[in-house]
Regions:
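Sec-dependent N-terminal signal peptides
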Residues: 4-13
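Single-residue recognition of alpha-helix boundary sites
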Residues: 13-14, 62
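Sec/Tat signal peptide C-region and signal peptidase I cleavage site
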Residues: 15-19
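Alpha-helical, heptad-rich or low-complexity scaffold/stalk segments
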Residues: 20-100
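Acidic, Ser/Thr/Pro-rich low-complexity intrinsically disordered segments
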Residues: 50, 130, 134-216
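Non-catalytic extracellular/lumenal accessory regions of secreted precursors
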Residues: 63-66, 70, 77-79, 83-148, ...
Length: 217
């Protein structure tokens, strides 16, 4: 099963001339791994918005238990634009979350002790087997970022996008023939799509920014 936050799957492609079947409107629930990643991201965002040390510590604890690796797309085409001086979103890593949690704790010994209980993973247990590919980037105002990723036939594929809250982001999944097979185009910047590929091959993931400023996801 391949997952991405942005989460995607990779393997060798086969050539087909017919369209990947579009998934049914009834959405399948997200996997436990993807649910944990999205929960951690939501907690981190809340923690930074409210200066909550406890929320950041819990986000770090969840992330520390989820195997992840950096997404390596087959190709990546970034929409043309600029960040217009907007400050970059804080990295949601275990180390950064705990560092900021300790600062927000303001000497509270209970919170500092909770932060110390979260064991920082040095990376030895975070491999590709059973993990999720993750990537952080910025989609410029009124632009679209395009990722090409290979997914495995018969294995559930999942893609989630969590923005910084400033604009509406939409997520679209296309097969190798350009057919739209899945989308999440609500009015938020939190998106999720899942499908089961009929064949092993390349899929295009498009992240569209509907707003007038860049959005860090």
């Amino acid at each position: 099963m391949k997952k991405i936050l942005l989460t995607l799957a990779l393997v060798a492609a086969a050539q087909f001339t017919f369209a990947q079947e579009k998934t049914d409107d009834a959405k399948q629930p997200a996997s436990e791994l993807m649910t944990q990643l999205r929960l951690a991201s939501d907690l981190a965002r809340y923690g930074y918005e409210t200066y909550s040390a406890s929320a950041l510590i819990e986000a770090a604890r969840i992330l520390n238990g989820v195997p992840t690796y950096e997404l390596t797309p087959e190709s990546f085409i970034k929409g043309e634009g600029t960040a217009d001086g907007k400050a970059q979103k804080t990295e949601f890593s275990v180390e950064q979350l705990l560092k900021d949690a300790r600062a927000y704790a303001d000497g509270n010994v209970t919170l500092l002790a909770l932060a110390d209980q979260v064991k920082i993973d040095n990376g030895t247990s975070r491999g590709r087997v059973g993990g999720a590919a993750v990537h952080e980037d910025c989609v410029y105002a009124n632009c679209t970022d395009n990722y090409t990723i290979r997914f495995i036939a018969g294995e559930e594929a999942e893609v989630a996008v969590v923005g910084d809250g400033d604009t509406d982001l939409d997520l679209y999944i296309y097969d190798s023939n350009g057919n739209l097979i899945e989308k999440d185009d609500d009015y938020t910047d939190t998106c999720y799509c899942s499908w089961t590929p009929k064949w092993t091959g390349a899929f295009t993931i498009k992240i569209k920014n509907r707003g007038g400023v860049c959005n860090y996801y």
